[in-house]
């Protein structure tokens, strides 16, 4: 791939990169959908494994792209569970109380230089994750200045709202455009 932009998406449902393509203009854009069995069954005993599978795949892909295409600027994004995957993959350390052997090692610090932006839509809050025994999402310090976290008003997954409908409105409430503009401005 020629130097350009690469979008790594961790999402709970099929995503379209059409809006992103219009934002990067003449630059080349590649899209990679993280390969993991996304689910909204947070109470399932298999749920933690699905998230770990996503972290492993996203981290491997980001690191591989950084090595094989060092001039390419990557954007990491996700919605809901995908936002959790994207957030966890940026962590500088394995969360306390998580067995180190059960999860992928954090990405090498130099990989952060290849990630232009991280956009998280409806990332589950610490309170929400805690209900299921999951650690809070801790964006690594090298990624914090390039991360945009968006939570819709009333969203009960990422915020303190009480509207289950709000969590499904990102595609129509303007926040996808806001995230795309943020990412494009960093490329």
From Swiss-Prot:
EC number: 3.1.1.-
Keyword Disulfide bond found: yes
S-S bonds: 15-69, 151-158
Cited SUPFAM superfamilies: alpha/beta-Hydrolases
GO biological process, one term: lipid catabolic process
Enzyme class: hydrolase
CC per GO annotation: cytoplasm; extracellular region; plasma membrane
Site (Transition state stabilizer): 81
One Pfam family from the record: Cutinase
Active site per database record: 80 (nucleophile), 155, 167 (proton donor/acceptor)
Keywords: Cell membrane, Cell wall, Cytoplasm, Disulfide bond, Hydrolase, Membrane, Secreted, Serine esterase
Cell compartments where the protein resides: Cytoplasm; Cell membrane; Secreted, Cell wall
GO MF annotation list: carboxylesterase activity; lipase activity
PANTHER family: CUTINASE 4, CUTINASE RV1984C-RELATED-RELATED
Purpose: May have a role in cell wall processes. Does not exhibit cutinase activity.
Family: Belongs to the cutinase family.
Note: A single nucleotide (T) insertion is observed in the Rv3724/cut5 gene. Cut5 is expressed as Rv3724a/cut5a and Rv3724b/cut5b in H37Rv strain.
Protein name: Probable carboxylesterase Culp7
Organism: Mycobacterium tuberculosis (strain ATCC 25618 / H37Rv)
